[in-house]
Amino acid sequence: MFLADHDIQHALEQVQAAFPSFTQWAYTNASEDESSLDGFSLWGQWVLRPEEFMARHFYLTFATHAEHWSGHLTIGQHFYFWTSADVGDAHLLDTEEYATLEDASVALKAEIARLCRALSVV
């Protein structure tokens, strides 16, 4: 699925509002090579301890497949270029496919909250 320009702007605004700690949002609206996804994908990043030499970069990616959206939490690089994963890169969480970006966003937030509860000592 590819998005029109006005839909891209709306999608960016939606994910920026849903995940305000993530920055440097970017997107692609086409297949650029065999190692990338077809269709529309957008991603933002959050850096844990950015002052460190080997800071860890977490990415949220929302990707389309056919007429559906899915959400992904990765570390090291965003889901869009996942076929070129390197040492230290990890695929952490995924959602199922949803009809809307909003539904995929809500589902990814729920998966992140579930992971945080599991890791919490409180």
Predicted regions and their residues:
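Negatively charged, low-complexity tracts enriched in Asp/Glu with abundant Ser/Thr
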Residues: 1-57, 121
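Intrinsically disordered, low-complexity regulatory segments enriched in Ser/Thr/Pro
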Residues: 49-103
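A short, charged, amphipathic alpha-helix used as a generic interaction element across diverse proteins
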Residues: 100-112
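Short arginine-rich
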Residues: 111-121
